[in-house]
């Protein structure tokens, strides 16, 4: 760079602004140079164009026409991210409104520009040095709201200095201060000038402009006066070294990665500061997400629980089973009751058992109700008369005691295997084996306790008494027919063939017509499909509730983020003024949106697990919360935050610095 090259140079710069249907010429062909080490005051009445000139010099705005050069390089044509890099490294800003972030301490406010610098480190030491320069070491733990106006402006100056910028831009730095604080601020600026700092200041007060060594006066968008004061001498201190290449800086800014320089961590911290600063609003905005995630967790817990219950129930029923039950005959359209036509016999059981190529075994059953009494205790229960093969087919062989023998069934012996519920109600913790009980006033000897089965979809499977089928038919219930026949098929592949063969046999034995509905044959696959269908329907219902809740919650998040963008427009302007790129602003608001939805998601996960536990305890429903459901809930929370936060984040990123800073 030649020694005569100015630090800043404007060549025939024009700037117009639309006002309603007309336009205002804020700058009309302004040309000027500012050299290293100058202290320049720009003066003029309201509407003269002085602020517009400062905004262009500080890269907060672009001219419509003309050139703006820094160190001889034309910069007004640079892309937005390139200008952001220059604002961060070349310029420091002091505003009339201070523009400090209320939620941050003054140390964090001062080191804020370094989030966007691409440099690693927390820069606390540099922030302390800047605060020491402006005399605020005794206020380190304070927030802006705890400081006076003069102290807040000193914090703003410290923030402007932390990156050791080439130029300090001050827009009415004393405009909101009393005379004493104004004097203190101007002494600080004067001292910085003596150290070699280039300062460009806008003011409308002559006594403030008197601190500058050069005064430019604006009127109607034109420079009408440019005076250097005779009293001014060269700065006493060394000048700030001009080593920054704007074009190299633009390339560096464009290549910055939020993952490499630690900015992402800063965005996360600031996002949660914003969330916790508005706790009630944040909580209300995530209610939809909370309900949606809780629904997902509860839905999947119920679905998994139902699946486990179905598997356990089918396991308790035995494998590769088909059941043959009596249907309902109809006379003139009126149902005649279960099994009114097809009343099965032991011959049916024997004939089915002889199908050796398809069937491993068959057992007939008869069902009724029974009153069982032991001592002074009695219990109403289900009474099942069953065959010998039933124990192994339906997994009822006792773990305590024994099962019936074929001889006991043939002789119609009065022996019983009782379920766990019956044993508990009649005997408590005592062993019932060998004791005599009365079933419908007939004495029976307890020979075994059936394995625990748990609840099925309609009843407690442990609330049952099993007796030999012949005993039940001829001694207790007084029947000469079977209610149902259970058939164990040799393989799952042979179930369809076995069903067809059994159907043909029943039709033949009972002389029924083809397609007669007086009996039906079912296998466990049909039962499983029926139960699974019910579970799927419930899951779809809960899934719909979850989807609607997530949609409503997402819209709530988008609404609250749009409000947040509006409320924080000046903050966005400040961040852009100190070097934030479009990507930085967009990512910050996206992180905040995702932070909200993840917070709602975490609360929803806890609520969903709690609801599942309550359903298990009070409703007796089977539930099973899985890691998969928690991962899915977290994933959908994050996706909702990204999807519904994208528009507000984009809106924030597209704000122009100068317009955002002026927002009322």
Swiss-Prot record:
Its EC number is 7.6.2.-. Coiled coil: none annotated. Keywords: Antibiotic resistance, ATP-binding, Cell inner membrane, Cell membrane, Membrane, Nucleotide-binding, Translocase, Transmembrane, Transmembrane helix, Transport. GO terms for biological process: response to antibiotic. The keyword DNA damage does not apply. Its main location: membrane. CDD domains: ABC_MJ0796_LolCDE_FtsE (cd03255). Residues 8-245 form the ABC transporter domain. One of its GO terms (molecular function) is ATP hydrolysis activity. The chain crosses the membrane at residues 283-303, 543-563, 602-622, 627-647. ATP binds at residues 44-51. GO terms for cellular component: plasma membrane. The keyword Membrane applies. InterPro entries: AAA+_ATPase (IPR003593), ABC3_permease_C (IPR003838), ABC_transporter-like_ATP-bd (IPR003439), ABC_transporter-like_CS (IPR017871), MacB-like_ATP-bd (IPR017911), MacB_PCD (IPR025857), Macrolide_Exporter_MacB (IPR050250), P-loop_NTPase (IPR027417). It is found in: Cell inner membrane. SMART domains: AAA (SM00382). Non-canonical ABC transporter that contains transmembrane domains (TMD), which form a pore in the inner membrane, and an ATP-binding domain (NBD), which is responsible for energy generation. Confers resistance against macrolides. Belongs to the ABC transporter superfamily. Macrolide exporter (TC 3.A.1.122) family. Homodimer. This is Macrolide export ATP-binding/permease protein MacB. It comes from Chlorobium luteolum (strain DSM 273 / BCRC 81028 / 2530).
